[in-house]
Amino acid sequence: MFAVAVRASQIPHLTRLNRRMHASADPEKIGMTLKQLATLASLRDRGELPQQSLCDVLRTSQNTVVMWLNELEELGFISRVRDADDRRKHNVAITPAGTAALERGELEMRRLEDEVLAGLTADERAQLRKLLAKALQEPG
């Protein structure tokens, strides 16, 4: 019975697909790590954010996000400024250099995605993207 349930589940397939993408995602080719790419994409999509809000968006601890932001700031991809209303807080924004690096990284990720999903037609890839986005939506 358990073997049938495992075969019926799509989770192992999604896990294997995720591992293939990560194995193919060479930071040298992308120009940054996948974590950095996700951070920049979040800032581009949402605009300037308080650092704590970015932690919530990325579902990652404050300490980890600070480490990522330090790396991105050193690269010139983000800027941190003190919140005008609460000087203890920092807001984070993507810089023009960060936007350019993100665009290059996303282009490489699309190329990798095409390689990993080569067995699917363009319509099937579009459907997969749509279904995955729907599955990842927050409830409510």
Question: Where are the regions a protein language model picked out?
Answer:
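N-terminal leader segment of winged-helix/HTH proteins
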Residues: 1-31
